[in-house]
């Protein structure tokens, strides 16, 4: 920890640097060194004899049943007891005020998962279970940035991240992108030609490297390595936001069908592009993961992985802010993951990949059929849930040229909604929406009924012909 402090203490925000442990957590860490039985009057927790929840049962598919459509469910039950059996979950402890880091059994499962998939290349790393992805990002921001700081972001990025950053008083510095993610040369140009009138050079980069929201781009391995090299050169902390990491897909093929071979864990892992966390050798990546796209959003659970200094500071904040994540949610999640095991969880993730690959392919097939190539430009996403369509502004009808790109895009969006089709307009994904210089629309293929894909894109095309020379 001392080495980490020397290396990264200067990255802590004023708020984070001044954070202390929660007072009751501090008391809990003080243990007696005698053999006298402790009679504790310290805790103000409610008496568990008055907990109206006596038992929790969770039903979910058995490993393999989702592939064979057998609908075979497993049911796991936990009962309230002062004496949990060895190896089982302590439901009483889960329902009481909990450990801020998370239920120990779930923490261990996730740490084992991180070790198996990402294999961090330095020793002093840890995780913190979060109340979902959004608060995970909030933790990272409060850890690192002060009011007035500049933060590096992709030119188009997750709107909730932008909304979370604005009240913190940060300035957005966009990095240009293409279909393979952020451009290292754009990053380097920003850093080398930094305008000191904006304040100190940025020391934080926020990125969604895989299946990026909204562009669907996936940062190539070569670029991932390059960005880590640049991060060391310019002393940058990278916040790696990865809710779509496990939704990686095969190259687009309209005739693609899922592989019916037995699940092979080695093959599954080899197909995953190495994460920034894996490539990081000195602890400058904070990775934010979520169960929302992998299990269900309503559990509001995720986790952060990073060096132990950063995780310790995040935990101090959580102790007096969100406290522990929901005990009930953690019990439900642990019941599923413990039953499946590490390999079963990965097998489930492969099934998710297959499901979303089929949906992506269906939307691309409809796009190839209905979107006019003279105006619409898009690429096949390699991961995630989104198709990002650019409309060629050079083919706008002249009567629209007296308006800004943002105004034209919004006008088209309103017309699309009136005509019964609703993508999302590109400017909502920008730190400064009024600076839009291109027209984009994002189509999500995760939820819409497959039978509506063609009709939706037909409506899109019939609407934009009012604005463009097709």
UniProtKB/Swiss-Prot annotation:
It is found in: Cytoplasm. It comes from Schizosaccharomyces pombe (strain 972 / ATCC 24843) (Fission yeast). It is an enzyme of class 2 (transferase). GO terms for cellular component: cytosol; nucleus. It holds the Pfam family Aminotran_1_2. Belongs to the class-I pyridoxal-phosphate-dependent aminotransferase family. It comes from the Eukaryota. PANTHER family: AMINOTRANSFERASE, AROMATIC_AMINOADIPATE AMINOTRANSFERASE 1. Has aromatic amino acid transaminase activity. This is Aromatic amino acid aminotransferase C569.07.
